[in-house]
Amino acid sequence: MGGCYSAYASSRKLRGRISKISLVIPDPVPDAEAASPRKDGVDGDGDDVRGGGGGCDDGGDVVAIATTTADEFARRYVLGKELGRGEFGVTRRCSDAATGEALACKTIRKHRRLAPPRVTAAKAAAAHGEDVKREVAIMRRMSSASSSRGGGAASSAAVVRLREACEDAADGSVHLVMELCEGGELFDRIVARGHYSERAAANIFRTIVDVVQLCHSNGVIHRDLKPENFLFANKSEDSPLKVIDFGLSVFFKPGDRFTEVVGSAYYMAPEVLRRSYGPEVDVWSAGVILYILLCGVPPFWGDNDEKIAQAILRGAIDFNREPLPRVSANAKDLVRRMLDPNPSTRLTAKQVLEHPWLKNADTAPNVSLGDAVRARLQQFSAMNKFKKKALGVVARNLPGEEVDKYVQMFHHMDKDKNGHLSLDELLEGLHINGQPVPEPEIRMLLEAADTDGNGTLDCDEFVTVSVHLKKMSNDEYLAAAFNYFDKDGSGFIELDELREEVGPNEQAILEILRDVDTDKDGRISYQEFELMMKSGADWRNASRHFSRANFSTLSRRLCKDTLTP
């Protein structure tokens, strides 16, 4: 799989063990609660934004979301084709019924939170409502801040504009209507332009850092900066680059520290894994993007999530990879200072913008970085598209929650009926249920899942971890994704089927085949597809619950010597 830098998979040893039991870590306890109008742990999803009046709220940095009806919403907006799908929602192209203006609509469906007996349905629904309110409040604040700026390197258009937000009175789903970005992804634009130089990278990167500075100056940590979250507004040569997704973002105040392990594997700062972080994590993630812009691959790479996390914690940056030896000293200095493992000495976003490499971006070397970098970026982008399609199918097929079964299992395993499962009760209960697991691994999982730190699991913790592991441990979802691509049912994903999903870019298709088609027969078998999905970062991170659980477990194991109790 050599060059497949965006693959999703897991440590086979850990995956094999975890798949035998019904445990994974639940959403962590909220942190820095006072800094946010809702709890830290947003589940809002719906992926990208690709491609006033009535019953909706428009603009304003408030958390109230007005209600509407399906008929009323349909009178105002015409929904079109699907643009992206996540675990809890879907993004579609839409248009203003009155003006015909092209827009995007991200619909976050009502997420039924796990509600064991002591948690009322009303309380669970309220928690979900707070989740969505935070995403809406952040988008409103950032839309307002961006539109009021004017001028500057990124001008006033660095953040996708939220037009309206409203909740369906019948099913509780929330519609976020926002501007449509049709200019394509960052890496696609770079590849299409042909000539790609350090100067071009500097001008692109200045916009990215300007977005980070805009977030931080408005009390927002993005927490999920990555190339896929930046789109061009339109196809014009001077189109603005916009950040599109605030689903994991949080409000913060100076001095706030967060503990929730969130983000995407390659872009995660070391202090996130250590469970104590602030806005500096966005600068780290932007530094990872800069490294990729300069050489086409991530600075911290591994065959699975654990190795990626280990590489991040080691912090060793390879400046010998072509073409980095030929890149200017200023560019490499900026990478080093943004990827400083110590957040207290890492540059701030404001300091990054004042760095000589960005202040003099227009005079940076205009010599091509070489075809190898463009090829790597093309490969990175093509594989992301292929993977994203597959993960969208997985998201569509995630099963409903089987809460009652796990509540009954909890009470059966709780021998002393004190409302908590001890290590001994877990070991005995798993053995009785035909799921014997070595004690050291049970200890590790218990520690990771025990959100209140009392050394046991209560019913809420047990049910949450059980349900989300069951969702993501079944490979039938991979089979469903494979069948989605295999339109003719031949048992192979063939060239025409790849073109239909990835687009007509022959070079991109060849890059996918080069990495995935291991027997070189010009098509992708299920075994090859499965191998692609199970190497690199864990494909199950498509579930934000699993992602939090996965990296929380890794952080506790890899950083146990530095974590505070």
UniProtKB/Swiss-Prot annotation:
Active site: D224
Lipidation (N-myristoyl glycine): G2
Domain Protein kinase: 77-358
Subcellular localization: Membrane
Family annotation (InterPro entries): CDPK_Ser/Thr_kinases (IPR050205), EF-hand-dom_pair (IPR011992), EF_Hand_1_Ca_BS (IPR018247), EF_hand_dom (IPR002048), Kinase-like_dom_sf (IPR011009), Prot_kinase_dom (IPR000719), Protein_kinase_ATP_BS (IPR017441), Ser/Thr_kinase_AS (IPR008271)
Expression across tissues: Expressed in spikelets and developing seeds.
Main location class: membrane
Entry EC no(s): 2.7.11.1
Activity regulation field: Activated by calcium. Autophosphorylation may play an important role in the regulation of the kinase activity.
Gene Ontology MF terms: ATP binding; calcium ion binding; calcium-dependent protein serine/threonine kinase activity; calcium/calmodulin-dependent protein kinase activity; calmodulin binding; protein serine kinase activity
Annotated spans, Disordered: 28-55
Catalytic activity: L-seryl-[protein] + ATP = O-phospho-L-seryl-[protein] + ADP + H(+); L-threonyl-[protein] + ATP = O-phospho-L-threonyl-[protein] + ADP + H(+)
Region Autoinhibitory domain: start-end pairs: 364-394
Amino acids binding Ca(2+) 2: D450, D452, N454, T456, E461
Binding sites annotated in the UniProt record for Ca(2+) 3: D486, D488, S490, E497
Note: Plants over-expressing CPK21 display enhanced tolerance to salt stress.
Function of the protein: May play a role in signal transduction pathways that involve calcium as a second messenger. Functions in signal transduction pathways that positively regulate responses to abscisic acid (ABA) and salt stress.
Domain notes: There are 3 contiguous domains conserved in the CDPK subfamily: a kinase domain, an autoinhibitory (junction) domain and a calmodulin-like domain. The autoinhibitory domain (364-394) inactivates kinase activity under calcium-free conditions.
Protein name: Calcium-dependent protein kinase 21
Organism encoding this protein: Oryza sativa subsp. japonica
Species classification: Eukaryota, Viridiplantae, Streptophyta, Embryophyta, Tracheophyta
